[in-house]
């Protein structure tokens, strides 16, 4: 007679502990707002340009401040590419340059394709 209530209590305990474990799993998986000891959550980048504006305004440069990298250079076409490991800088002449994806081409291939496109051949 005592076995039935004890079994019911034990079953209820197992269901509650399983549900709690599932909620903890989903909370951790989806970055729930609970405080976790030992884990620092990185702050998400803002969707507005306030950080960029503050950094731009706080940067000291007496020459030209590159808008993409905030590098201080003598001329705009001297600006480095933001991602040099995957981009190639192509000078267009007239003091301007663009950064293009390397895309697996051989060295100088991007510049050649841009020049052909400028001539209307490509």
UniProtKB/Swiss-Prot annotation:
Probable component of the endoplasmic reticulum-associated degradation (ERAD) pathway. The gene is lcl2. The keyword Transferase does not apply. Keywords: Signal. InterPro entries: LCL2. GO terms for biological process: ERAD pathway. Belongs to the LCL2 family. This is Long chronological lifespan protein 2. Residues 1-21 form the signal peptide. The lineage of its organism: Eukaryota, Fungi, Dikarya, Ascomycota, Pezizomycotina.
